[in-house]
Regions:
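Accessory carbohydrate-recognition regions in carbohydrate-active enzymes
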Residues: 26-302
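Ser/Thr-centric signal marking residues that sit
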Residues: 305
Length: 305
């Protein structure tokens, strides 16, 4: 009898120890210690947007171009945003990338500015996620990413016609006049009212070629092309959508340095659904797995860094 009672006591103690170990192994959110806005001011040349560790996508806002100030495409001291491109250099001190600039907007489709002031106090960024409100258009923008795909979610708040500018000519350059010449060759095809595919060959810091697939979760109801300037090879497309106030459009962009098929496979493998929250969570998990290698008990942290 005593032996049986002893067995149950040992079993209970082991169970308590097991539960305490499980509780102590609850994953810590290391992303909360990271502040992507560090280095965004003069001339830190960092970007606040979304990416995953060692990914080829860095989807982020652009606030200016054509000078050394904008090697990463963004300066937090600026008051307006021109759009959101799919890849960026970080802290390099040289301009390049900034491929496929996308801007959601509303109202008159022939908008001469194609930029908006933004609410800095509501701007958010943590590893794998970025959000901002374009105050002139009343559009909330959210960005996340996988290794080879970017995902955008645009929520249109105003009761005005909803549009998206897809600028395939844009890129981060040293001088504004290079915006017309840095694209050496370009091909683009509209597959249907949901998909755009193509390739660009560009030369800024180096000559390179990339292939893309752009997909929308809602069909565009109309499309226009902006008049190209002399020397430009790629197109700027204006897409219109039939939305009610509060509805959103999601955009996915797959990139490849090999082929359009490679960009499509990236979407199929890494981002097959229209589940923004799932991709956002997976991106945060990828960062947490990497950041967990750091022993925070040895560091006194008062602010995100």
């Amino acid at each position: 009898m005593k032996r049986k009672e002893c067995f149950w006591w040992v079993f209970a103690i082991i169970g308590v120890c097991f539960l305490s170990i499980r509780c102590s192994n609850v994953k810590e959110d290391y992303c909360c210690y990271v502040n992507p806005f560090i280095g965004n001011a003069d001339n830190g040349h960092t970007f606040p947007g979304a990416c995953v560790p060692f990914g080829m996508i860095q989807v982020s806002p652009e606030s200016g171009n054509g000078s050394w100030r904008y090697c990463s495409g963004f300066n937090i001291e600026d008051d307006s945003i021109m759009g959101f491109s799919q890849n960026h250099l970080n802290g390099t001190g040289c301009p390049d990338l900034g491929d496929i600039l996308i801007l959601p907007f509303c109202g008159d489709i022939q908008n001469e500015k194609y930029k908006s002031r933004y609410e800095k106090e509501h701007q958010k960024a943590h590893p794998g996620y970025y959000s901002v409100v374009l105050s002139d258009f009343g559009v909330e923008v959210e960005l996340t990413a996988t290794q080879r795909t970017a995902m955008h979610r645009y929520t249109f708040r105003k009761a005005e016609p909803a549009h998206i500018l897809v600028d395939l000519q844009s890129g981060i350059v040293s001088k504004n006049e290079q915006l017309r010449t840095h694209v050496i060759d370009a091909e683009m095809q509209l597959l249907d009212q949901y998909s755009i595919v193509g390739k660009n060959k560009v030369k800024m810091w180096v000559e390179r070629e990339f292939f893309y697939v752009i997909k929308f979760d809602k069909p565009y109801i109309d499309i226009e092309e902006l008049q190209p300037q002399e020397g430009e090879k790629a197109k700027r497309l204006l897409l219109s959508f039939d939305l009610k106030p509060g509805e959103n459009v999601q955009v996915k962009v797959g990139l490849s340095t090999v082929s359009i098929e490679g960009a499509q496979k990236a979407l199929e493998k890494e981002n097959p659904d229209w589940n923004f929250e799932k991709v956002k969570a997976q991106s945060a998990e990828a960062w947490n797995n990497l950041l967990s290698r750091i022993d925070l008990s040895l560091i006194h942290i008062s602010e995100p860094t």
